[in-house]
């Protein structure tokens, strides 16, 4: 909303389909309106690629290959009661279902962490839901007396970490990574950012804008 107040135009439900270049310089981005069905060409002098788990795909559209963003899929479940007044986190090695967050009249338990093949096609396996509910009962006795009202999945845009297995998303670093494609690929006019967490998104935005 702040960006809109300063004149930004926000296009929701628009998917990037191609990135155009004039020589070695980014010149435009083509997006597809997933609701209206039309394609829109956006001329630009610079692109900040903040595409999350799709950032590597967008970079490749500009012939900037090898941006290794690993989608780390996780599910969360909302229960129909607010079972605590503050966040509860189990003091254990990182695991599934080890944090409970109160939110208005409900509470949310999370989260799993598995590598996804495609961030556009995330599943919510029944066995993972069951595992999360069992973990909630271990954290708060009586947890299972509440009813699960909603479950959803998302993908973390993790940067490939050579210190762990390529599929071990739980232990991949959560730090941010900014790539200047002029320095890396000889393509002027695009920066890519990946990694980070929701708690650091404002810092990430500040850093990439400062570099631009």
Q: For the regions a protein language model found, what residue spans apply to each?
A:
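Flavin (primarily FAD) cofactor-binding/catalytic cores of flavoenzymes
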Residues: 2, 13-16, 32-36
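C-terminal catalytic lobe of FAD-dependent flavoproteins
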Residues: 2, 57-61, 65-75, 79-108, ...
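General small-molecule cofactor/ligand-binding pocket signal
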Residues: 9-11, 149
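A conserved short coil-to-beta-strand element within the FAD-binding core of flavoproteins
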Residues: 12-27
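Core beta-strand elements of the Rossmann-like FAD/NAD(P) dinucleotide-binding domain
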Residues: 35-46, 50
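Short, surface-exposed charged micro-motifs
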Residues: 9, 18, 43, 97-99, ...
């Amino acid at each position: 909303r702040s960006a809109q107040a300063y004149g930004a135009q926000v296009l929701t439900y628009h998917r990037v389909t191609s990135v155009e270049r004039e020589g070695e310089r980014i010149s435009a981005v083509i997006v597809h309106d997933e609701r209206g069905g039309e394609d829109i060409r956006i001329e630009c002098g610079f692109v900040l690629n903040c595409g999350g788990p799709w950032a590597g795909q967008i970079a490749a559209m500009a012939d900037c290959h090898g941006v290794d963003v690993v989608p780390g899929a996780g599910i969360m479940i909302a229960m129909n009661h607010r079972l605590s007044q503050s966040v509860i986190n189990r003091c254990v090695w990182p695991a599934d279902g080890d944090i409970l967050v109160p939110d208005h009249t409900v509470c949310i338990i999370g989260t799993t962490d598995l590598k996804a093949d495609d961030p556009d096609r995330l599943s919510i396996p029944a066995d993972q839901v069951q595992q999360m509910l069992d973990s909630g009962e271990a954290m708060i006795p009586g947890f299972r007396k509440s009813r699960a009202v909603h479950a959803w999945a998302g993908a973390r845009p993790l940067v490939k970490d050579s210190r762990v297995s390529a599929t071990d998303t739980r232990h991949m670093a959560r730090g941010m990574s900014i790539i200047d494609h002029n320095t890396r690929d000889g393509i002027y006019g695009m920066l890519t950012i990946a990694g980070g967490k929701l708690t650091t998104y404002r810092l990430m935005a500040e850093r990439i804008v400062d570099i631009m």
